UniProtKB/Swiss-Prot annotation:
Gene Ontology CC entries for this record: cytosol
Family the UniProt entry places it in: Belongs to the phosphoenolpyruvate carboxykinase (ATP) family.
Protein name, UniProt field: Phosphoenolpyruvate carboxykinase (ATP)
Organism: Maricaulis maris (strain MCS10)
Database matches in InterPro entries: PEP_carboxykinase_ATP, PEP_carboxykinase_C, PEP_carboxykinase_N
Compartment(s) where it occurs, according to its Swiss-Prot or TrEMBL record: Cytoplasm
Gene assigned in the entry: pckA
Catalyses which reaction(s): oxaloacetate + ATP = phosphoenolpyruvate + ADP + CO2
EC number annotated for this UniProt entry: 4.1.1.49
Length: 537
């Protein structure tokens, strides 16, 4: 690292003429600075409370990738909005001008715990609390690693910058611009800190597959020795965080991981958990972080006099969040690494009540369901609508996948085959009927089924083939009511189940048409079947 990079984090070399550079400030300094500047307040227990204003979630429609010779054939343009190199040039010039003479906070951090595949990143912020946030979320170098630190990507986040759609080729005053050739991400016009976290994820999702490393939107746990690992894929609301938090196992991470020849590794060093209506009974470890010094609470309502938090109040945001280091969780991994997985779990919250509580997948079925990324959400009740809606988010994280999903799917299939991993589909949604008539799958049953899968005993169970989806469903499992293992038997109206199952199968088939041309015939053959019912049925 050059002398200038040691002094200013390499900003001058980027053409940034900052007034003051606060390089690698630690948590106490950033805490104090955020409060003194009026960016944040301290809650009872010591957490830092901040408000992000108009933006309380990601601005997905304001994210753009530079379309140039490097990215033209690498990026999945059906899913990623493009910006021209000329528009990005104008944006970069205006960002440089906006930073001139300003006080900036710079963190030199690693994305990834695998020493062979981690990414050194430079994160530039104008807000002290943003600098604290990303210091929690990424991995802080050891003291001796700073001397040789050379950032390979730069992320600059300036909430006070307002983009000009005509000049910058964007959609609004908010912009997230990614230039893979120049290795720069520019974030402007939003204070929502999750944009920085997900920018790092997007970068790694682009870079790692070229190295044969699989990036994943998932949680991971292992046994205390770092072996017998399990990957949990799942969209929001499927139970990914809850089910991977197991007191008898080590939590490697809750959101973003890679799978390399060395095993599994966390991209992050912290967690970014949903706080709304968080329960001390249901999730005690996460709830405890709300009363911890160091935690950054985003859009959590606090009494201005008593400084007591109200986690049930959604007046600032439904998407209230807490950022804290992984070390705040008692059974978290110190290294962020573990061995190769023994099991892959794909979680779905099926509000239609069709999916079994657990099913075993072949490698082809695993790739099919990974590319489908299915869950079902319950519609809002503001107009009295209670009909569930199907959600398909490919790779269980479509907004963060720059490459074509088939590229990630093929890599996952190869790794599953190489390491002989068992794959399971787990439904945490409804049984005995759809949402409104059925009941939520008992979490006790889900945990018992997961434990049987993870300890290997489920492999010796008797299975039946599901007539709609073709996967194998256990007939009996110790500690689980056998009736819930057959979803059709739990419905009082069997004809209604058959009709709904056919509709869901059709949704899968329609959704997968996007990927059919990009996958092998045996993966296409893993699709569900819309079957003709016999008179007996």
């Amino acid at each position: 690292m050059s002398k200038s990079e040691r002094l200013d984090g390499g900003l001058e070399a980027l053409g940034i003429q900052a007034g003051t550079v606060n390089l690698n400030w630690n948590e106490p300094r950033l805490y104090q600075e955020a409060v003194q500047r009026g960016e944040a307040e301290v809650a009872e227990g010591g957490a830092l409370v901040v408000k992000t204003g108009a933006h309380t979630g990601r601005s997905a429609k304001d994210k753009f990738t530079v379309r140039d010779s490097e990215t033209e054939d690498q990026v999945w343009w059906d899913n990623n909005a493009a910006i021209s190199p000329e528009h990005f040039d104008a944006l970069w010039t205006d960002f440089q001008a906006h930073m001139a003479g300003k006080e900036l906070f710079v963190q030199q951090l690693f994305g990834g715990a695998d020493l062979d595949h981690r990414l050194p990143v430079r994160v530039v912020n104008e807000l002290a609390w943003h600098s604290l946030f990303i210091r929690h979320l990424l991995r802080v170098p050891a003291a001796e690693e700073y001397a040789g630190f050379a950032a390979e990507f730069t992320i600059i986040n300036l909430p006070s910058f307002k983009a000009d759609p005509a000049r910058h080729g964007c959609r609004s005053e908010t912009v997230i611009g990614v230039d893979f050739a120049r290795r720069i991400v520019l974030i402007g016009g939003t204070s929502y800190a999750g944009e920085t976290k997900k920018s790092v994820f997007t970068i790694l999702n682009y870079l790692l597959p070229a190295k044969g490393v699989m990036p994943m939107h998932c949680s991971v746990n292992s046994n205390p020795n770092g072996e017998d690992a399990t990957i949990f894929f799942g969209l929001s609301g499927t139970g990914k965080t809850t089910l991977s938090a197991d007191a008898s196992r080590t939590l490697v991470g809750d959101d973003e991981h890679g799978w390399s020849p060395n095993g599994l590794f966390n991209f992050e060093g912290g967690c970014y958990a949903k706080m709304i209506r968080l329960s001390a009974e249901a999730e005690p470890e996460i709830h405890a972080t709300t009363k911890m010094w160091g935690t950054v609470l985003e859009n959590v309502v606090m009494d201005p006099q008593t400084r007591v938090l109200d986690l049930d109040d959604d007046s600032l945001a439904e998407n209230s969040r807490g950022a804290y280091p992984l070390s705040a969780i008692p059974n978290a991994s110190e290294t962020g690494r573990c061995g190769h997985p023994k099991n892959v779990i794909m979680l779905t919250c099926d509000a239609f009540g069709i999916m079994p509580p657990i099913a075993k997948l072949t490698p082809a079925q695993a790739m099919y369901h990974f590319l489908s990324g299915y869950t079902a959400k319950v519609a809002g009740t503001e107009k009295g609508v209670t009909e569930p809606s199907a959600t398909f988010s490919t790779c269980f994280g479509a907004p963060f996948m720059p490459r074509h999903p088939a590229e990630y799917g093929a890599l996952l299939r190869e790794l599953i085959a190489e390491h002989q991993v068992d794959c399971w589909l787990v439904n945490t949604g409804w049984t005995g009927g759809a949402y409104g008539t059925g009941n939520r799958m008992p979490i006790k049953a889900t945990r018992a089924l997961l434990n049987a899968a993870m300890d290997g005993s489920l492999n010796s169970a008797a299975f039946r083939e599901d007539p709609n989806f073709g996967f194998m469903v256990p007939i009996a499992v110790d500690g689980v009511d056998a009736s819930i293992l057959d979803p059709r038997s739990t419905w009082s109206d069997k004809a209604a189940y058959d009709d709904r199952a056919a509709k869901l199968a059709t949704m899968f088939i329609e959704n997968f048409k996007t990927f059919e041309a990009h996958v092998a015939p045996y993966v296409r053959a893993a699709a569900p079947k819309v079957r003709e019912l016999t008179a007996a049925e």
